């Protein structure tokens, strides 16, 4: 780990971390990322695995999606996370890509950031001067941008052990694709993907539910305070429609769980 931190400090913005490569390599192919130096952190043992810390489940940032998907511990204590991981790409991607890479990429259309936001996850970043914890609500700051500094490594993700009713809904044009829109429900929290530059909480939906609105009424507010784009996958208006539909479906599914 220290060698990785030293390399980041030496090369700064010219360097990129490489673990699974699921997010970085496609960007490099399209020249959207052109690092001069790649720092391979896939072999750092302390960045992989699932452990407990107090009332949290701790997942190392270099843990493969497939490990999160199939881990008996994750399935028992955080089924939303295990299920979301099962929808990331195809089996090849899940066996190579990492949870930390998906999060650090900062793509609002990715699956895991949306569910982690709904769970109020905590992200631990390490630099040469120590570690700091970043709340999910503060971690995603812009289009493909996170709160990580160029000299920091995301080392783990902490999710609460408290069991909540949950759901993850995802609409795609093609199977195993990025989400056109996604919705995660965890307890009283609702998060949306691909409805803004970053994953966002559907605060108006949450407030309506707390005030006694029924699910159908609350879900109509899902697209409030969002800024979906129009692209080859969907128009902004269709994304707004999807947000309302997926949120209602997710709330109903979560309510039906024991």
Tell where the protein language model's regions lie, with residue ranges.
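C-terminal structural segment of proteins
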Residues: 1-258
